């Protein structure tokens, strides 16, 4: 790493290729997250508005869209275009307000994801532990929880907010970092602590969740299993993030880490951003149906809505729906 000028010796084509293949999967993930937001907030709002899990998950999707857009437009453009390093770095260096806003926003978006996941994990546990009162309790307190989610990251990034920023040149490009005003409050150490806390809470809540599911009725167990599995799998991504943050927290001055630190950070970050929506789409047939428009999603949605009617009317309507659906398949 250099703090004075762009590092020469990097092939433009090779570095540009890194950007374009990362653009391919990150832009795809942005589109998927945008589609999920549209389903939860607009097209199927009447179905998801009272489901606290999906309300929390939509916040995660929204922050992921902002973070991935920030990565593509700024972070990785600065890093993977050596031919533009001199001109870009001069513009950024002379824009301290931009550097402050950019770095604070990036740090905030990275810090908020573990906080959201803590609430998602607790949400799944409370669903199986208190199935009768779960929905009402979370609906009443969701607004307070959202306020906590949006404010909690400031406990991690407060030193970033009051510190100065600078440009560091690495891998033919450059990145923006900060000079700690409070020397002991390292951002990497704060993020490592938060992610470790997230992993520990998730392990406890997931264990309790799966244990309680063994005592639940089969119908309820089947409906909740998908979301619980999704929350557990997403936790694996945070475990990988914890390992990466431990390198930055305890070995950041090591010469071997300087050459690979961006690749490590990008790899674990992208696993979380890209993997989270894919996991939920893979394990939940109903949600996948709404997002992708498949027939199973529409069928399950009809069944879910019909559950609000009386038992006799439900049985009659459901039978007619199945019969009409059968005739439609025969005649199509």
Swiss-Prot record:
InterPro entries membership: 7TM_GPCR_serpentine_rcpt_Srg, Nematode_SR-like
Record-given protein name: Serpentine receptor class gamma-3
Cellular compartments annotated: Membrane
Entry coiled-coil feature ranges: none
Record membrane topology: Multi-pass membrane protein
PANTHER family: SERPENTINE RECEPTOR CLASS GAMMA-3 (PTHR31627:SF9), SERPENTINE RECEPTOR CLASS GAMMA-RELATED (PTHR31627)
Nucleotide-binding found in the keyword field: no
GO CC aspect terms: membrane
Pfam families: Srg (PF02118)
Gene Ontology MF annotations: transmembrane signaling receptor activity
Family stated for the protein in its record: Belongs to the nematode receptor-like protein srg family.
Species annotation: Caenorhabditis elegans
Tree of life domain: Eukaryota
Membrane-crossing residue ranges in chain numbering: 23-43, 72-92, 101-121, 144-164, 184-204, 231-251, 263-283
GO BP, sorted A to Z: sensory perception of chemical stimulus
Annotated keywords: Membrane, Transmembrane, Transmembrane helix
């Amino acid at each position: 790493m250099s703090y004075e000028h762009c590092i020469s010796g990097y092939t433009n084509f090779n570095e540009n290729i890194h950007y374009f293949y990362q653009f391919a999967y990150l832009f795809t993930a942005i589109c998927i997250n945008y589609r999920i937001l549209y389903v939860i907030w607009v097209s199927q709002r009447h179905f998801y508005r009272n489901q606290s899990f999906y309300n929390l998950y939509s916040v995660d999707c929204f922050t992921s869209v902002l973070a991935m857009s920030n990565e593509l437009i700024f972070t990785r453009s600065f890093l993977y275009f050596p031919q533009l390093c001199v001109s870009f770095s001069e513009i950024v260096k002379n824009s301290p307000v931009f550097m402050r806003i950019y770095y604070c926003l990036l740090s905030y978006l990275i810090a908020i994801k573990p906080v959201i996941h803590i609430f998602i994990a607790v949400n799944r546990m409370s669903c199986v532990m208190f199935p009768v009162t779960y929905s009402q309790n979370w609906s009443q307190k969701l607004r307070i929880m959202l306020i906590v989610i949006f404010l909690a990251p400031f406990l991690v990034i407060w030193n970033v907010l009051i510190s100065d920023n600078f440009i560091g040149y690495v891998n033919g490009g450059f990145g923006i970092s900060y000079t700690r005003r409070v020397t002991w409050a390292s951002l990497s150490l704060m993020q490592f602590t938060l992610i470790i806390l997230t992993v520990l809470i998730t392990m406890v809540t997931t264990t309790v969740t799966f244990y309680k599911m063994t005592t639940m009725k089969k119908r309820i167990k089947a409906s909740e299993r998908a979301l619980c599995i999704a929350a557990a799998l997403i936790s694996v991504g945070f475990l990988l993030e914890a390992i990466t943050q431990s390198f930055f927290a305890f070995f950041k001055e090591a010469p071997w880490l300087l050459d690979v630190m961006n690749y490590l950070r990008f790899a674990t970050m992208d696993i979380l951003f890209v993997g989270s929506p894919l996991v939920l789409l893979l394990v939940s047939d109903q949600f996948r149906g709404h997002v992708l428009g498949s027939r199973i999603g529409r069928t399950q949605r009809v069944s879910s809505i019909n559950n609000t009617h009386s038992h006799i009317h439900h049985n009659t309507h459901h039978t007619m729906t199945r019969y009409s659906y059968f005739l439609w398949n025969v005649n199509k």
